[in-house]
Amino acid sequence: MKIAFATQDRTHVNAHFGWAKTIAIYDVSPRGHQFLEAVEFNGELAEDGNEDKLGPKLEAIKDCAILYVAAIGGSGAARVVSSNIHPIKVNEPEAIDTILDKLQAVLGGTPPPWLRKAMLKDKPRAVSFDDEQLQHG
């Protein structure tokens, strides 16, 4: 499962989604986690209500199931959720490695319902039909 982190320093969740310089992306499973990429953003990143800066960030995280942020605006959160990504706001800057370790431990046990749903993001839905349903007798 891919997880995205809004960060200014690549080691902590410490950035507002809209003005994050970097989105760090990791793959996490019950067996471990692996750094995949850091997507850098330049240009105007001020917290100014300019929604145009969100497009490239949403594109960068489109395959992620969860996004960790220090803060996120209402419209940004709505766009993240509409992309089937679960945003999580940290109360204070937190080390990405610490979050990954906690997430890995939860995945190894019994994940809460919201996390089980997030884990299904990239899984194709299995559709099965009983033979009886296919008969139009």
Provide a role label for each language-model segment.
Residues 1-56, 63, 88, 93-137:
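Non-catalytic interface/targeting segments
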Residues 59-92:
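Mid-chain, well-packed structural core segment of small domains
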